[in-house]
Amino acid sequence: MIRGRKGFTLIELIVIIVIIGILAAVAVPQYLDLTRSSANGAARGILGGLRSANSLLFASRIIGGTTAAYNWTNVVNNAQIQGVEYTYGTQTFTMTAGGYTYAFELSPTDPQAPTTPATIYCPATTTW
C-alpha cells in the first residue's frame, strides 16, 4: 500500500462531473428565462413611457388650444426614450431589448386634440 498519495479517485471525479452537469442543466434554462423576463420588463417600461407621453401630449394640446394632428415623432420626442434601440414609422414603433423585438402601434395614426385621442397598443403578434 502506497501512503501519502494525494488526488481524487476516478469515481470521485465522475460524481463531480455528474453534479456539475445537473447544475448546468438547471441553471441554463433559468438564465435564458431571466433574459427574456428582463427584456419583457424593459418593453413594458417603454410601452408605459410611450402611453404617458401620448397622454401628456394630448392634454397639452387641449390646454394650449392646438388642434393639429400629431404622430409617433411627437410621442417619441415627448417620451425621451434612452437605453434601447428603436425605430418608428407612421403607425408602428419597434424596439429591441435583450435580443428580442417588440412592436407597438398608434391608433389612429393621426390623433387630433380635443376630439380624437390616440391609443398605443401591442398588436396580436407581440408575445410577452
Which residue stretches match the model-derived regions?
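Short, flexible coil/turn micro-motifs enriched in small/turn-prone residues
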Residues: 2, 16-19, 44, 60, ...
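Generic N-terminal initiation segments characterized by hydrophobic and/or small/turn-forming residues
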Residues: 7-10, 29-31, 43-47, 78, ...
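Short alpha-helical interface patches
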Residues: 20, 36-40, 72-80
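Periplasmic/extracellular, small/polar-rich flexible segments of pilin-like filament-forming proteins
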Residues: 55-128
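Generic hydrophobic-segment detector
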Residues: 11-17, 38, 43, 55, ...
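N-terminal single-pass transmembrane signal-anchor helix
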Residues: 2-35
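Membrane-proximal N-terminal amphipathic helix
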Residues: 38-64
